[in-house]
Structures are given as C-alpha cells and as structure tokens.
C-alpha cells in the first residue's frame, strides 16, 4: 500500500505547484517558528533547517506518510530579504532589488514515517530584476501581491513583469523546486510522474 503524501505548508504557491502535476496529497499546516536572517548561519543552512522543522512537526501526527516541507529565501548582497512587513517595506525592498541580481534559495526536506528517514536538498537560482520605475513599484505594491512573499515579488504573478531574466529553476523561485523534489522522492521509491 502506498503511503499518503503530505505537504507540510501554508503556502498557496507550493500547494498549487504540487497540485498542478496531478498527484494526490494532503496539506497540513506545520505551525513552526521559521528561522530568519542570521549572521551566524548561511541561507543554505537556514532553508534546509526550516524545511526540516516543518516535516518533523507534521511527522508527530502522521506516522505512515511521505512528508514534504520547503522553505525559500531571497538573498541580496549576502543578506536574507524576507517578506515585507508592510507596503512601505515592500517598496523599499523592490527599490533595493531594482536593476540587480539576487539569489533565491529553496530548501526541500522529505521524510518517510514511521521510519523517520529524511532527505534534504537546497536549490539556488539567480534572478535579474529589470530597471523598473518608482511608479511601477507603487502600482505593483498596490495590488497586494508582494505582501506574503520573500523579496516582495511573485514571479508567477504580476511580479514577472519586474524580472529581466532568470538562471536556474523557475519553480525554485516560485517556492518548490519540482525536479529536485522528484529526485528526492525517487530515493524513497516514489515519483511525481
């Protein structure tokens, strides 16, 4: 009997991405405190740790499952850029990103219960924002779209209009690197195909 697949996430984007490939899964909110910007830890360590916390929390209740967790951060000049606190903060973040490259890191953790076997991985993509105007920033922020997103933009929505180019995995930038997730699941004997 195949184990239930559980996505440990509150993210509408991760839910959509996993749903779009047509597999059956259950969404469970992990309710964990995520680690944010830290001078002592790298973005790789932070996203891996946050993804792992999510699957471990959900594993407390689901003892016969494959549990998927993920975390994504935006990094500019070595600094983690989180979700904006308010519209003013979103404008500030988007001005900092304007006409520059930044990196997006996503950590993915997959746990099989009851064995508690865990695999983790981190994917990095590079994004170049275009030289958009202050007026474009204000119009974009007024849509409300950037308010729940690391880096204050959503590449899968209107935020795509702010991006000049990407290098790497598009789905990583959205928040769930599907190809890497599939390779982790393959090691448990599962496939997204």
Swiss-Prot record:
The UniProt record lists the keyword Ribonucleoprotein: no
Protein's UniProt keywords contain DNA repair: no
Subcellular location: Cytoplasm
Job of this protein: Nucleoside triphosphate pyrophosphatase that hydrolyzes dTTP and UTP. May have a dual role in cell division arrest and in preventing the incorporation of modified nucleotides into cellular nucleic acids.
One Pfam family from the record: Maf
Protein name: dTTP/UTP pyrophosphatase
Similarity remark: Belongs to the Maf family. YhdE subfamily.
Keywords of this entry: Cytoplasm, Hydrolase, Nucleotide metabolism
Active site (catalytic residues): 71
HAMAP family for the chain: Maf (MF_00528)
Family annotation (SUPFAM superfamilies): ITPase-like
GO CC, one annotated term: cytoplasm
Enzyme class: hydrolase
Annotated site, Important for substrate specificity, chain positions: 13, 72, 156
Gene Ontology MF terms in the entry: dTTP diphosphatase activity; nucleoside triphosphate diphosphatase activity; UTP diphosphatase activity
Organism whose genome encodes this protein: Dictyoglomus turgidum (strain DSM 6724 / Z-1310)
């Amino acid at each position: 009997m195949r184990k239930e697949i559980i996505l440990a996430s509150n993210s509408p984007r991760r839910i959509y991405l996993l749903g779009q490939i047509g597999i059956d899964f259950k969404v469970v909110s992990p309710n964990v405190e995520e680690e944010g910007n830290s001078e002592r830890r790298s973005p790789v360590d932070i996203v891996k740790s946050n993804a792992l916390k999510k699957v471990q929390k959900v594993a407390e209740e689901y003892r016969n499952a494959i549990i998927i967790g993920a975390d994504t951060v935006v990094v500019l000049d070595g600094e983690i850029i989180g979700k904006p606190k308010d519209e003013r903060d979103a404008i500030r973040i988007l001005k900092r990103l304007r006409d520059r490259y930044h990196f997006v890191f996503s950590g993915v953790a997959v746990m099989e219960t009851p064995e508690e076997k865990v695999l983790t991985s981190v994917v990095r993509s590079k994004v170049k924002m275009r030289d958009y105007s202050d007026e474009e920033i204000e119009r974009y922020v007024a849509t409300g779209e950037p308010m729940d997103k690391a880096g204050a933009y959503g590449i899968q929505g209107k935020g795509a209009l702010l991006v000049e180019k990407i290098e790497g995995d598009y789905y990583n930038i959205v928040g769930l690197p599907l190809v890497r997730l599939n390779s982790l699941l393959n090691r448990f004997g599962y496939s997204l195909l």
